[in-house]
Swiss-Prot record:
This is Polyribonucleotide nucleotidyltransferase. Its main location: cytoplasm. The gene is pnp. NCBIfam families: polynuc_phos, PRK11824.1. Mg(2+) binds at D490, D496. The lineage of its organism: Bacteria, Pseudomonadati, Bacteroidota, Bacteroidia, Bacteroidales. HAMAP family: PNPase. It comes from Bacteroides fragilis (strain ATCC 25285 / DSM 2151 / CCUG 4856 / JCM 11019 / LMG 10263 / NCTC 9343 / Onslow / VPI 2553 / EN-2). Residues 629-699 form the S1 motif domain. PROSITE patterns: KH_TYPE_1, S1. Its EC number is 2.7.7.8. It comes from the Bacteria. It catalyses: RNA(n+1) + phosphate = RNA(n) + a ribonucleoside 5'-diphosphate.
Length: 708
């Protein structure tokens, strides 16, 4: 009989979360089944016993997978089986990875695999907000070294009140949606979108989230005690030579500090200078000695380089490229650079450059979303590409990676609330990073704003973005908040805090922290300093283009929308789509129709106004209600001995009796010169109340001859 160990977390709103271990996946180093309502996630962790020789980083791999069976659904596609990870699953992986990675010991290099699987879902509670807790709990019941526990929660603001882990329905009403990860003591990661909130409101949301996370962390500590996994495995993944470490520091620190303080703005020249110092030190050793000590020298020199850069900033306020801590790199922008797309822009900030294009599409271009729990259509798309040449790397470009999906998602969230809800076009923004030295996702936001305005998209307000950094040594009061960080400042610093927004508030944020003990005072200073930087960048954007263009590019599609009564939808489509397809062939316009809120919504698009006007005329003809006494221009469809049948509205034929053709008596219709295909004006004089047949007259429109 299996006796699983269960820990229950009581939430403030009456809901509960249970963490169960010892029942499933017992051969993993740690496994926990998390349950909230009918949502169940299994998290497992496995770690190699030893590190791969030569590994000097943390080889952590996080996988998140949603089973379609969890929600009682079949996967799509020919194989009817789960395939490669969706963007949503990749983004959830990244949320968990970014929270866990900083908390493994610096000298722990064994491969660690975290797998989180959604086995049951009810469509009410959101599983991505629970994945971090499940993963941390699995680590907590394992013997893998980890300086946790952590947890993640989603906090949303609905009608002015903060809600922890809202339901799908609640989130639709929120004006703030952020994910926060933290240990019991410190916030580690933040990511989310919002409707132009203030810095103080964002900080308040983070504090509310942290209080909820503390409850989760305490429960995991108690679960660890219950399982008896308080002692972690021993490991030795790094061998050190303290004499060599001291020799590297003594020989290289002053030279490295001089490079760090030189203010060279060219990152390749600067790195070459740093590398030359290391190579000079290595030159004193033989090839045999370097085989033994070369990797250690590289690691120790990296520490020297890091210390020199950090001390230069803290002690002198000098950054690697010579800027002050609050200074933004030089910016230049250009719009309309590419003639082919419907809008384009170049945004260059220092050595980071984005070339962004905008394409306007119709309803047929909507992205269909068919994930396990998310269904619908996306009308605003943003794609981010980061080719190797942007950093001068000589390597092949593979498919879209997790990083590109994550950076694109952040820029998408920064801009999407600025697109009017009733905007008729489907919009695709593509950012190609051509140069990169930090903050490329923020360059995408700025270039995206410029390109959207160049395309004539009526965005509500321009958006700018900035990446902030932090230098803070443990045990020191002194710290430095850096505006518009370089790639090296991101790598060697303690924080990467990206903030985007308009002149009136923040629209999106993403923060990763690598140090303990980061106070809310420091976060507040970083947010306020970010606001100053955002306003400066926004000014540069508005100098280039101050508002959206009033006219679309000549080759952009034109779109008109109209609504019709629900009962006419079938008439517009026709049997097997015959009518709507015929109208498209006749006019050259693209016509789509759907039922929304009990009415038919029609979208007509084309490359010229005439095709759209012709399509509108035909549709109006179909949905028009024939009125007795109205005059119509009709087409003679057939000739009979007793008269002619005339199509006076699309799909509506009436009888023009021979006696109604002319005032004089006719023996045949042809006597009046009427033949099939002729267009003639007729008046609707009657509708048979029983059969609904239409009676037409031509003679009432002709002058009546005087009686002799």
């Amino acid at each position: 009989m299996i006796n699983p160990i269960v820990k229950t977390i009581e939430l403030g709103d009456g809901r509960t979360i249970t963490l169960e271990t010892g029942k499933l996946a017992k051969q993993a180093d740690g496994s926990v089944m998390l349950r909230m309502g009918n949502t169940m996630l299994l998290a497992t962790v496995c770690a190699a016993k030893d590190a791969v020789p030569g590994t000097d980083f943390m080889p952590l791999q996080v996988e998140y997978k949603e089973k379609f069976a969890a929600f009682g659904r079949f996967p799509g596609g020919f194989t009817k089986r789960e395939g490669r990870a969706s963007d949503y699953e990749i983004l959830t992986c990244r949320l968990v990875d970014r929270a866990l990675r900083p908390l493994f010991p610096d000298n722990y290099h064994a491969e660690v695999y975290v797998n989180i699987i959604l086995f049951s879902a009810d469509g009410v509670d959101m599983p991505d907000a629970l994945a971090g807790l499940a993963a941390s709990a699995a680590l907590a019941v394992s013997d893998i070294p980890f300086n946790g526990p952590i947890s993640e929660v989603r906090v949303a603001r609905i009608d002015g009140k903060f809600v922890i882990n809202p339901t799908f329905d609640q989130l639709e009403q929120a004006d703030m949606d952020i994910m926060v990860a933290a240990t019991y003591e410190n916030i580690m990661m933040v990511e989310g979108e919002m409707s132009e909130v203030s810095e103080a409101e964002l900080l308040e949301a983070m504090k509310v989230a942290h209080e909820a996370i503390k409850v989760h962390c305490k429960a995991q500590m108690e679960l660890t005690e219950m399982v008896g996994k308080t002692v972690k495995r021993e490991y030795c993944h790094e061998e050190n030579d303290e004499e060599l470490r001291k020799a590297v520091h003594d020989a290289c620190y002053d030279k490295s500090y001089a490079i760090a303080a030189s203010g060279n703005r060219n990152k390749h020249e600067r790195q070459d200078a740093f590398d030359a110092i290391r190579d000079e030190f290595k030159a004193q050793f033989s090839e045999e000695e370097l085989e033994e000590k070369g990797a250690l020298i590289d690691r120790y020199y990296h520490d020297v380089e890091k210390e020199a850069m950090r001390r230069c900033i803290l002690d002198e306020g000098k950054r690697l490229d010579g800027r002050k801590t609050t200074e933004i790199r030089p910016i230049w922008c250009e719009v309309g650079y590419l003639p082919g797309p419907h809008g384009s822009a170049i945004f260059t900030r220092g050595e980071t450059q984005s070339l962004t294009s905008v394409t306007l599409g119709t309803k047929l271009d909507e992205k269909i979303i068919d994930d396990v729990l998310a269904h619908g259509k996306e009308r605003f798309l943003l794609h981010y590409n980061f080719p190797p040449f942007s950093t001068g790397e000589a390597k092949a470009q593979r498919g879209v990676g997790r990083r590109e999906i994550g950076h694109g998602n952040l820029a998408h969230r920064a801009l999407k609330r600025m697109i009017p809800e009733d905007y008729p076009y489907v919009v695709r923004v593509v950012s190609d990073i051509l140069e990169s030295n930090g903050s490329s996702s923020m360059a995408t936001v700025c270039a995206g704003t410029l390109a959207l305005m160049d395309a004539g998209v009526k965005i509500k307000k321009p958006v700018s973005g900035i990446a902030m950094g932090l230098i803070k040594n443990a045990g020191e009061e002194k710290y430095a908040v850096l505006s518009d960080i370089l790639g090296d400042e991101d790598h060697l610093g303690d924080m990467d805090f990206k903030v985007t927004g308009t002149k009136d508030g923040i629209t999106a944020t993403q923060m990763d922290i690598k140090v303990d003990g980061l106070s809310y005072e420091i976060l507040e200073r970083a947010l306020n300093q970010a606001k100053e930087g955002r306003m400066h960048i926004l000014g540069k954007i508005e100098e280039t283009i101050s508002e959206p263009r009033t006219e679309l590019k000549d080759h952009a599609p034109r779109i008109e929308t109209m609504t019709i009564p629900k009962e006419f939808i079938g008439a517009v489509i026709g049997p097997g789509g015959k009518i709507i397809q015929g109208m498209q062939e006749e006019t050259g316009a693209t016509i789509t129709i759907e039922e929304i809120d009990n009415v038919g919504r029609i979208e007509i698009s084309g490359t010229n106004k005439k095709s759209i006007d012709d399509a509108i005329r035909l549709i109006k003809g179909i949905v028009a209600v024939p009125e007795v006494g109205e005059v119509y221009k009709g087409k003679v469809r057939s000739i009979m001995p007793y008269g002619a049948f005339v199509e006076f509205l699309p799909g509506k034929d009436g009888l023009l009796h021979i006696s109604e053709i002319d005032w004089k008596r006719l023996e045949t219709v042809e006597e009046a010169g009427i033949k099939e295909g002729d267009e003639i004006e007729v008046k609707l004089i009657d509708i048979d109340p029983k059969t609904g047949k239409f009676k037409l007259s031509r003679k009432v429109l002709l002058p009546r001859p005087e009686k002799k």
